[in-house]
């Protein structure tokens, strides 16, 4: 199975730019190899921060954006599994993240999507999860 992003769907009104898409693909590949609950923040095909092994996604997101610091502005964020609540997206947005990739499929996907849309961000759904427990 080769995941190149061709089958991903855009859940938001705004589609990613070419640079954002490259960063989303890079972050997704990194998240795939990190212990769950994995969150990766990346920009210019460089990992800026990661959160892993936490009991929930929002704690992983907090770790990732803290490591990225000010460089998170305009960055991409990848989650190795679905984002069950909008809090993970809100943490990313609060630190300047403007592009998200996640499997999708959460009961509350519409809330996460609306949060990203409201901030002018883009969000892609892969349809594939990567758990490393």
What is the meaning of each model-derived region?
Residues 1-133:
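ATP-dependent carboxylate/acyl-activation modules
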């Amino acid at each position: 199975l080769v995941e190149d992003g061709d089958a991903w769907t855009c859940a938001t009104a705004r589609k990613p730019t070419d640079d954002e898409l490259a960063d989303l693909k890079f972050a997704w590949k990194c998240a795939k190899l990190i212990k769950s609950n994995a969150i990766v923040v990346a920009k210019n095909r460089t990992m800026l921060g990661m959160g892993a092994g936490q009991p929930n996604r929002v704690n992983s997101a907090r770790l990732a954006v803290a490591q990225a610091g000010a460089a998170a502005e305009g960055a991409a964020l990848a989650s190795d599994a679905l984002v069950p609540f909008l809090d993970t997206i809100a943490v990313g947005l609060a630190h300047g993240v403007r592009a998200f990739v996640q499997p999708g499929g959460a009961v509350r996907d519409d809330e996460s999507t609306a949060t990203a849309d409201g901030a002018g961000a883009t969000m892609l759904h892969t349809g594939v999860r990567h758990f490393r427990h």
